[in-house]
C-alpha cells in the first residue's frame, strides 16, 4: 500500500516502563507503570521543537500514520499531524501517548496487577485524574530529555490536560493549545457521564468490573454508553443533514428494530466502540472528566489558577458544540485576559458539533498552523531561550 504524501507513514509504538512508584491524587500508589507512546518527526539538536498531543476520552497514542501496510484507517488526528499539515512533522517532533487507565497498551484495568498474582486489575485499578495524567506525561518528558515542550496540544479531555500542564508545569511549555474544552464540567455534563456509567454498571455481564475473570463482557452497557455519548458529540444540524428522518427501508415497519437511519448509525457506532474499548477504562475516563477543576485548590477561582501560567495560549471553540459550548472556552479566555496573559481565541463556525476538533476545517487548520509557527519561529524562540 502506498500512503498519502502528507502522511507520516508506518509508525511503530514504543512502550516506556517506569519502575518508580506513582502516587496518585486518590491516595493510592501504582508500584510501577507503563506508557504506550508514538512519535512522529525528528527531535532537533537543542530539543526545542517537541509537541505533546493529549488525547480525549476514547483516544490513545495512535494519533497519526498507520501501523500496518494494509491499515484502512489512519491515527485519530491524522488530518492535522504530518508533513506539511497544521502540526508539521517536517518541523516538529510530535509525541502522542495513551494515558494510564487506558486500554491501548498503557497500564490500566486490563493490565496485570502485581499485587494480585498478576490477574487483571479490573475494578481494582485506582481512579486517576487529569493531574495524574499530566504528572506521568512530565515523567515521560524527562525520559525523552525534553525539559520544555514547544507546545502542549489537546482537544476535549485532551484540552483539559493541556490546561493542567500550564498550571502545574508553567516553566515546561511555551505554548498551550486548548480545543473544544472547558475549565470544568457542568452539572449537565456530569449527568451525561453518569447515565453512561450506569448503563455499564447495570449490565448483568459487568460482574462488578470483574468480567474478564468471569469470561464475560458488558457489551450491551458499553454500546449504550457510547450511543449516549455520541449524541452529545454531534450537533443537531449535523444530524439533520446526515440523517434527517430518513428511513432505512423507506417505510415504517411498526416495530422496535432499526427503522430510522440515525438509529442504525448509533447502533453501529456503539457496536464498533464495544469491540475496541474496555468498560472499566470507560468508567475511569468519565470520572477523570468529572473530577477536573484546576481552580479547586485556588479558592475555586479560575482567574487565580491561571495567574500561575507563563505560556502563550490558543483557545479554540466551535459554534455548534453544545457538549463544551463556546461560553466554556470564553471562561478560560476571560481568566487569562484578567491576568494579562497572552491568549488568542477563535470561535469557529462549524456544523460538526463537539467532534469538529477532529475535522480538517480550513480556518481551524490555518489558525493552528499559524499559532504553532514554523522553522523561523523555532529559531527565534531558541535564541530567546538561550
Swiss-Prot record:
Substrate binds at residues 226, 355. GO terms for molecular function: homoserine O-acetyltransferase activity; homoserine O-succinyltransferase activity. The keyword Acyltransferase applies. Transmembrane segments: none annotated. Residues 49-358 form the AB hydrolase-1 domain. One of its GO terms (cellular component) is cytoplasm. Its main location: cytoplasm. It catalyses: L-homoserine + succinyl-CoA = O-succinyl-L-homoserine + CoA. GO terms for biological process: homoserine metabolic process; methionine biosynthetic process. Transfers a succinyl group from succinyl-CoA to L-homoserine, forming succinyl-L-homoserine. This is Homoserine O-succinyltransferase.
Amino acid at each position: 500500500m502506498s500512503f498519502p504524501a502528507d502522511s507520516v507513514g508506518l509508525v511503530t509504538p514504543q512502550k516506556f516502563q517506569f519502575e518508580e512508584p506513582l502516587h496518585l491524587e486518590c491516595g493510592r500508589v501504582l508500584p510501577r507503570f507503563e506508557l504506550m507512546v508514538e512519535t512522529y518527526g525528528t527531535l532537533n539538536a537543542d530539543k526545542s521543537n517537541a509537541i505533546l498531543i493529549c488525547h480525549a476520552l476514547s483516544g490513545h497514542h495512535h494519533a497519526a500514520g498507520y501501523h500496518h501496510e494494509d491499515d484502512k484507517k489512519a491515527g485519530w488526528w491524522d488530518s492535522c499531524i504530518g508533513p506539511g499539515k497544521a502540526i508539521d512533522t517536517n518541523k516538529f517532533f510530535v509525541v502522542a501517548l495513551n494515558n494510564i487507565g487506558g486500554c491501548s497498551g498503557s497500564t490500566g484495568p486490563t493490565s496485570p496487577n502485581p499485587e494480585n498474582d498478576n490477574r487483571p486489575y479490573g475494578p481494582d485499578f485506582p481512579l486517576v485524574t487529569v493531574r495524574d495524567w499530566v504528572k506521568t506525561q512530565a515523567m515521560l518528558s524527562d525520559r525523552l530529555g525534553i525539559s520544555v515542550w514547544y507546545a502542549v496540544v489537546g482537544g476535549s479531555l485532551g484540552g483539559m490536560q493541556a490546561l493542567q500542564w500550564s498550571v502545574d508545569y508553567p516553566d515546561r511549555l511555551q505554548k498551550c493549545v486548548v480545543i473544544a474544552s472547558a475549565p470544568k464540567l457542568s452539572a449537565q455534563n456530569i449527568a451525561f457521564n453518569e447515565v453512561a456509567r450506569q448503563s455499564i454498571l447495570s449490565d448483568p455481564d459487568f460482574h462488578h468490573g470483574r468480567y474478564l475473570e468471569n469470561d464475560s463482557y458488558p457489551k450491551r452497557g458499553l454500546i449504550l454508553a457510547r450511543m449516549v455519548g455520541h449524541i452529545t458529540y454531534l450537533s443537531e444540524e449535523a444530524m439533520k443533514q446526515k440523517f434527517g428522518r430518513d428511513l432505512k427501508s423507506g417505510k415504517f415497519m411498526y416495530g422496535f428494530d432499526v427503522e430510522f437511519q440515525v438509529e442504525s448509525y448509533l447502533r453501529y457506532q456503539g457496536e464498533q466502540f464495544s469491540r475496541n474499548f474496555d468498560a472499566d477504562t470507560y468508567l475511569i475516563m468519565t470520572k477523570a472528566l468529572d473530577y477536573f477543576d484546576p481552580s479547586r485548590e485556588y479558592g475555586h477561582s479560575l482567574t487565580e489558577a491561571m495567574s500561575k501560567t507563563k505560556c502563550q495560549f490558543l483557545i479554540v471553540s466551535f459554534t455548534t458544540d453544545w457538549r463544551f459550548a463556546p461560553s466554556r472556552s470564553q471562561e478560560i479566555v476571560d481568566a487569562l485576559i484578567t491576568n494579562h496573559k497572552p491568549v488568542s481565541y477563535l470561535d469557529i463556525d462549524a456544523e460538526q458539533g463537539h467532534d469538529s476538533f477532529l475535522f480538517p476545517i480550513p480556518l481551524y487548520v490555518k489558525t493552528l498552523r499559524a499559532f504553532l509557527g514554523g522553522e523561523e519561529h523555532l529559531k527565534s524562540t531558541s535564541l530567546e531561550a538561550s
